[in-house]
Amino acid sequence: LDLILNHTSDEHPWFIKARAHPDSPEHAFYIWKEPRYDAAGCPLPPTNWASFFADSAWAYDEQAGQYYMKIFSRKMPDLNWANPILRQRMEAITRQWLDMGIDGFRVDAVAHLARDPEFQDSELPVNAQGLAADWSKFSNLPALFDYLRECKQTVLAGRDCLTIGEVGGGASPQMALNYADKETGAF
């Protein structure tokens, strides 16, 4: 089964509630930031990070009055894996699939569950739109492996299932061991 942990659809009930109710638990399931403003008072993204699709990694939501992170498409808002309640929900969903008899997962975009917690602009060169293609801001970060090991312990331990992670974002061969080492790896 293709398991997508990085994002939901912008039509998912969680995101719809998150947009409409900033005080809801669902709002904290996503990565929201206040805008910066230009001289004319127009909202600007909170960082200069580019998405994998070369536009901003942020989309402004008029209803919420904030930017949400989306490293792929504005139709795919990123989940906030720093939120322990979100992690518990995603782990429960994964367990449910296993309980229904699924014998494995291809984990889509798994390298991107953690973000640079400082949310500072990248210092890499920027493109004509002022955006930096700096995957180090949201790929293969140390917290990712904490999240995945937690999932391994709470969901996968004791189960006979196959997991294959789609890993990108400039993962090195050494980093591959963080994912796949039999004793200490995340899968």
Where do the language-model regions lie?
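Acidic/aromatic-lined carbohydrate-recognition and catalytic surfaces
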Residues: 1-95, 99, 111-171
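Noncatalytic carbohydrate-binding groove/subsite architecture in carbohydrate-active enzymes
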Residues: 167-187
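Structural preference for beta-strand elements that scaffold enzyme active sites
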Residues: 104-106, 160-164, 187
